[in-house]
Regions:
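Glycine-rich flexible loops
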Residues: 1-211
Length: 211
């Protein structure tokens, strides 16, 4: 199992090829978010993949979507990975595919906020996020932006994202977190105590920004 060069900024260590069980809710959440154009497939690049990822806490570690999935519509069980531990840059996992390139961010958020059970990372339209009328509503909607630019795939991303959460109910914009081939969208993150709440929070902001 090879690591995509420059894409995953940590060392994935496969403990087994066992596919995690009971992932239907997570996979259905991805289908829902993709239907709202929040988990878009890559275009304008030779890379295969789609924006965003979703994770759910388990007794040890968490289950997260795999990396470089062409689409997040109707994912299969093998499109999910159980990340068991993350120590010194080694992400130890069970699954048939490599874990999401943002797994380190998810790990740090779960460690920082022990009460949360789910994390939703989407890429929202810049036209919605940064329009002048909508920027004046950020405080009202609970939207905050990270203080620093946030790239991808490193523990620093996790730390900077965690610091941006003023409350667990915040909707955090990851400043300048956008790939070169998709400059019209920026990554955002919500955390919650249930997967349903996390998905609903992302969709609620999406719909509010369209008003």
């Amino acid at each position: 199992m090879s690591t995509p060069s420059g894409f995953i900024q940590f060392n994935p260590v496969q403990l087994s090829a066992t596919v995690p069980e009971n992932t239907s809710p997570l996979r259905e959440a991805c289908t829902t978010l993709a239907a709202y154009d929040l988990h878009t497939s890559y275009t304008g690049t030779d890379l295969i993949g789609s924006n965003g990822n979703v994770s759910v806490r388990r007794t040890s570690g968490f289950v997260v979507t795999a990396t470089q999935l062409p689409s997040k519509h109707n994912l299969a069980p093998e499109d999910c990975v159980h990340l068991e531990t993350c120590v010194d840059g080694d992400a130890r996992f069970h699954g048939a595919k490599l874990p999401s390139s943002e797994s380190i961010m998810h790990w740090h958020l779960f460690e920082t906020f022990p009460d949360i059970q789910a994390i939703v990372h989407v890429h929202e339209s810049n036209a919605l996020l940064y329009s002048e009328p909508n920027r004046t509503r950020w405080a009202e909607l609970g939207i905050v932006e990270s203080a620093q630019d946030i790239g991808g795939g490193t523990i620093e991303v996790g730390r900077a994202t965690a610091e941006a959460f003023t409350t667990e109910s915040s909707y955090v914009i990851l400043k300048n977190h956008r790939p070169d081939w998709d400059p019209g969208r920026t990554g955002t993150v919500v955390i919650h105590r249930t997967l349903e709440e996390a998905v609903n929070s992302a969709l609620k902001i999406h719909e509010a920004l369209k008003q």
